[in-house]
């Protein structure tokens, strides 16, 4: 059997996260069911990481093995015929070496967070964005974002249930950009703790909305105290943008 890599996109709104759960709809569950229909046998998939309930992906990476002889283009069409109605799309398929693992071979990951920062919008424009009524300062937000660059202990922005042995993560890029009525936060890191990006976002927004000192964010980061982090930002505005490999 050859190992197949798939680039996939999905709307996480209707799912209880990526990882399979016996009694709840998940992205992994839907893909494995689709593969079983085609392969006629159970297929286990592996991913670059697990997105939480409500979080979307533009280019998630998964791998799997199937025994049937089928051209990749035909496999892609067959999978999309099943998955598209469930808000999941196969973007690309290709063969990879058996030694490749979507999670452990990954070098960096990129996430984005979408903030709707305007009163002039249609109701559906907030579907995959976090609405903030107050006009936000891109300059203030970017000064806080600069604090994230480098290797830090992110205990403050970790979840109690996170089982990672080390809370140190390396952040390579973090920046806010204005795009029309939206403000987009982009962050690239070696990897991320459970709910880390949303916790960071919620804290930065709370500091900006309350007109607190920009230095407050750095103080909170360095405290390594979860109790100092502010309300975690909603999941519906978070996107896994891409995963980087050598």
Curated annotation (Swiss-Prot):
Keywords: Isomerase, tRNA processing. Its EC number is 5.4.99.12. Substrate binds at residue 111. It catalyses: uridine(38/39/40) in tRNA = pseudouridine(38/39/40) in tRNA. One of its GO terms (molecular function) is RNA binding. It comes from the Bacteria. The active site is at 52 (nucleophile). It holds the Pfam family PseudoU_synth_1. One of its GO terms (biological process) is tRNA pseudouridine synthesis. Belongs to the tRNA pseudouridine synthase TruA family. PANTHER family: PSEUDOURIDYLATE SYNTHASE (PTHR11142), TRNA PSEUDOURIDINE SYNTHASE-LIKE 1 (PTHR11142:SF0). Formation of pseudouridine at positions 38, 39 and 40 in the anticodon stem and loop of transfer RNAs. Homodimer. This is tRNA pseudouridine synthase A. It comes from Borreliella burgdorferi (strain ZS7) (Borrelia burgdorferi). The gene is truA.
């Amino acid at each position: 059997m050859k190992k197949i890599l798939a680039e996939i996109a999905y709307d996480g709104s209707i799912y209880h996260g990526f990882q399979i759960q016996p009694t709840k709809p998940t992205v992994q569950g839907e893909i494995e069911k689709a593969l079983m229909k085609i392969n006629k046998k159970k297929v286990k998939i592996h991913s670059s990481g697990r997105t939480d309930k409500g979080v979307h992906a533009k280019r998630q990476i998964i791998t799997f093995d199937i025994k049937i002889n089928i051209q990749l283009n035909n496999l892609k069409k067959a999978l999309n015929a099943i998955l598209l109605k469930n808000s999941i799309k196969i973007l690309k398929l290709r063969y990879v070496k058996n030694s490749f693992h979507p999670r452990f071979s990954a070098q960096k990951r990129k996430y984005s967070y979408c903030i709707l920062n305007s009163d002039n919008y249609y109701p559906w424009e907030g579907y995959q964005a976090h609405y903030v009524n107050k006009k936000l300062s891109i300059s203030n937000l970017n000064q806080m974002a600069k604090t994230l660059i480098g290797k830090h202990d992110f205990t403050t922005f970790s979840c109690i249930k996170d089982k990672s042995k080390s809370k140190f993560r390396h952040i390579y890029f973090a920046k806010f950009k204005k795009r029309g009525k939206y403000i987009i936060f982009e962050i690239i890191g070696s990897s991320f703790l459970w709910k880390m990006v949303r916790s960071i976002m919620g804290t930065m927004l709370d500091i900006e909305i309350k007109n607190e000192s920009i230095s407050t964010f750095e103080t909170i980061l360095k405290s390594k105290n979860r109790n100092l982090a502010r309300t975690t930002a909603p999941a519906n505005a978070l996107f896994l943008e891409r995963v980087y490999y050598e």
